[in-house]
Amino acid sequence: MAPTEQPVRTFRFERDTFAFPHELVWQYHFDPVTGTMTTFNSNPPPTYYHRCFVMVRSTRQFFYHARFAPELPPVAPEACQRIIREVVSRNPRRACAESERVMVPGYDGLRSFSRAHEPLLKAEMGGAWQSYFLRSHWRMVFPVHRWQQKRMGEKLKQSLPQRGLSLVHLFRFPRITINHGIVLYGLAESEQNLEFEAYDPNIPEHPVKLVYERKRRVFTFAPSRYWGGGVLSVVEIFCDWPY
């Protein structure tokens, strides 16, 4: 594990997440009796999609490398473009020193900044290909065993306080019913579960929860507009080699 060496700030959902959603290519319907999933094209068609991993990576880059200064006046769009390019060019695995952070004047966090500059952020954070070509994607094609998920749960429990937020890949394979990235930023622990509080780029309105069940040694994710709920595989990404 290679956690950040810099002091970790507290991540706040209402301040440190994007105001706009990652859009769905399809709309999903889940049969309440059988659980069968059917899909149909979104109407109107989405304009910002296949970038969930771009968004979770960028969330961390702003958390690790930006310093928001609401007391200063906002700058022109051209300057905002330079700010965004600088932040998303930084290392998503390690925070910089406080003195090296990129100043973002006029806003108190990523949510207010992204509300004001949505088109710029979408244009500059990276294309859909960056969601497909992640060095960690090799892991999803190999079996994920319960003992490995137990280790992953404990790893996330240990690393989250050091990193400030952890990025994870949620998937089912070989039948790909989910292939998605979210941001973990909080943890509630009991004898039965590790309950991670998370930001889902598909659902910017409120936090979601990813649960590790100790008895079954599995991760579960609640039903949503794009996932029927249940057990899935979890791998931490943008962390240590080879992820």
Locations of the language-model features?
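Cys-His-centered catalytic/binding microenvironment captured across papain-like cysteine peptidases
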Residues: 2, 175-179, 188-243
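Active-site-adjacent substructure of cysteine-protease-like catalytic cores
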Residues: 144-189
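Residue-identity detector for glycine
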Residues: 35, 106-109, 126-127, 153, ...
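Context-gated lysine
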Residues: 122, 150, 155-157, 209, ...
